[in-house]
Amino acid sequence: MVFSTGNGDDNSKGLERVIVITSGKGGVGKTTTTANLGMSIARLGYRVALIDADIGLRNLDLLLGLENRVLYTAMDIVEGQCRLDQALIRDKRWKNLALLAISKNRQKYNVTRKNMQNLIDSVKELGFQFVLIDCPAGIDVGFINAIASAQEAVIVTTPEITAIRDADRVAGLLEANGIYNVKLLVNRVRPDMIQKNDMMSVRDVQEMLGIPLLGAIPEDTSVIISTNKGEPLVLNKKLTLSGIAFENAARRLIGKQDYFIDLTSPQKGMFQKLQEFFLGEE
């Protein structure tokens, strides 16, 4: 099975990008980020594989609305119970997007670093241009296995001191494991709280961590509705600000640097005001 649809040429062998989405702290929106970035990149025409590496606590299938189509998992591949093409679930909405789910009934110690590397290598052989790995929370063996084949990382955090401390720890571990291309995504930003000095601005968070900013996602109650429906925010017919922010982050991730919001613009439209709120600009 070769995923031949998509943007770019089909001579991208060896140019695949393997990106781990991680956080350190649970509950910051890492899986939501994986689903929305992956779907956005697929909608831009690229071949995308999403891999849920959170053994025993998988949720990526739910956020994508694919839970009823999971017949085999990565564990079944490791144990020789099925082939990779049998376990990969192709999204019916965007056929250049596929999901490889992980087992709900196993422990993280059932998969080795080598197992994960072999899985990623096999996925890359199918012609995917982007492989996004939803990393488990924490910094134990599950984290080490999930980052084994990644060349890049996106650290997801919120403007809370505990989440920032964990993100800093994760950044150090990524560097120690040879992953130097790291970007920051700050989730659940509340402009109203930033104005009142009740929340750190995105600029504060970025300066504390010293990581290039990929995007800032405003707090959005639509996330709950989106999760329950099994549809990423970026698929909403009427995009919310968080959906737009995820789409812009995805464009920046693939190298479309022209999608940064221009702070030098004399017009203070909605997006510039949001940028000012997020970055603490006057």
Curated annotation (Swiss-Prot):
Q: Could you list this entry's UniProt keywords, alphabetically sorted.
A: ATP-binding, Cell cycle, Cell division, Chloroplast, Nucleotide-binding, Plastid, Septation
Q: Which SUPFAM superfamilies has this protein been placed in?
A: P-loop containing nucleoside triphosphate hydrolases
Top-rank taxon: Eukaryota
Biological process (GO) annotations held by this record are: cell division; negative regulation of cell division
Give the principal location in a single coarse category: plastid
Q: Where in the cell is it found?
A: Plastid, Chloroplast
The cross-references to InterPro entries, in alphabetical order and at most eight, read: CobQ/CobB/MinD/ParA_Nub-bd_dom (IPR002586), MinD (IPR010223), MinD_FleN (IPR025501), P-loop_NTPase (IPR027417), ParA/MinD_ATPase (IPR050625)
Q: Is this entry keyworded Heme?
A: no
Disulfide connectivity for this sequence is: none
Give the residues the record marks as binding ATP. K25, G26, G27, V28, G29, K30, T31, T32
Q: Which Pfam families match?
A: CbiA
One cellular component term (GO) for this entry is: chloroplast
GO MF terms here are: ATP binding; ATP hydrolysis activity
As for family, the record states:
Belongs to the ParA family. MinD subfamily.
State its role. Answer: ATPase required for the correct placement of the division site.
The protein depicted here goes by the name Putative septum site-determining protein MinD
Task: State the organism of origin.
Answer: Chlorella vulgaris
